[in-house]
A protein has these predicted regions:
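Conserved hydrolase catalytic core segment
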Residues: 102-141
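Conserved HGGG/HGGXW glycine-rich cap/lid loop of the alpha/beta-hydrolase fold
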Residues: 23-76
């Protein structure tokens, strides 16, 4: 039996869709529609529901918008298999335009963190605050191997519980109940009664799990808004040295580390994640 942290409650949310020239994007919202928007971007193989606990914690202060990025959750799959940062960027441009996000805060995890970094290059003037979660311009090989290890397992199993068992073995930091809740939003049942992932199988290919070459360091140097860099204490994804360099390159940034957390920081230790990230976001929001 694992000593997992307590799980916060989840509030109900609303569902919406944005039509882009390439895919249909599904998003979830919490909070007052008139409040400052807070956009949340998940990692590879995840869904908008990844953020449910954190979104619940933020709904009294923001209009929270969590997106199923292309190829994930209930959003459309890329017709040409394009899951590059540029493709994600086009989708997010459409989301920002159609939801009329004149000014917003942005939080991105892993793949979503890198997509968030690229987004600052085009929408920096709109950003109130930025949170980059366990993602950096350079990805250690250990991270890619770990992610691919989980995604490269069997993609069809007899039951949801079979997926839960596999997830428990892969990430013992989280309770069976929280893993099941997360998986239920990330699985679909096949006509023969078996279960498989919602995400596009193309994403299981290692070559599709990387963003295209580009100098993210130069992008970081131009970020004008206050930035919080969050890393998991037990995660290989964002080494202390790289996080420290990011904080030096970004003009107004600092680093926080979440204890008892691997790569999926906000799910492994949601209480501490909220305690360290919420004040950073709310401070600017209440300042007007």
């Amino acid at each position: 039996m694992t000593n997992t942290p307590p799980t916060p409650p989840i509030a109900p949310c609303q569902e919406g869709f944005v039509e882009t020239p390439e895919v249909r994007l599904r998003y979830l919202t919490w909070g007052d529609p008139g409040a400052t928007p807070l956009v949340l971007l998940h990692g590879i193989g995840q869904t908008a529901h990844t953020w449910a606990y954190f979104a619940t914690a933020m709904q009294d202060h923001f209009r929270v918008v969590a997106v199923d990025q292309r190829g994930h959750g209930d959003s459309g799959w890329a017709p040409d298999g394009d899951y590059s940062a540029a493709a994600h960027g086009r989708d997010l441009d459409a989301l920002i335009l159609q939801l009329r996000l004149e000014e917003f805060a942005l939080v991105g995890f892993s793949m979503g963190g890198r997509n968030a970094m690229w987004l600052t290059d085009r929408h920096g003037a709109r950003l109130r605050r930025l949170v980059i979660v366990d993602a950096g311009p350079q990805r250690p090989h250990a991270t890619g191997s770990s992610a691919r290890q989980f995604m490269s397992g069997p993609d069809v199993l007899d039951s949801v519980e079979d997926f839960v068992e596999r997830a428990v073995r892969f990430n013992p930091r989280r309770s069976r109940e929280t893993l099941r809740e997360s998986l239920l939003h990330n699985l679909r049942q096949l006509p023969d009664g078996k279960w498989t992932w919602k995400y596009d199988p193309v994403l299981r290919q290692p070559s599709r799990q990387t963003t295209p070459a580009g100098d993210l360091w130069s992008v970081l140097a131009k970020i004008a808004c206050a930035t919080l860099i969050v890393r998991g204490a037990e995660s290989p994804a964002l080494p202390e040295e790289q996080a420290a360099r990011m904080a030096e390159v970004i003009p107004n940034a600092r680093v926080v580390t979440i204890s008892a957390a691997g790569h999926t920081v906000m799910g492994d230790n949601p209480i501490e994640f909220e305690a360290k990230v919420k004040p950073f976001l709310v401070e600017k929001n209440t300042a007007g």
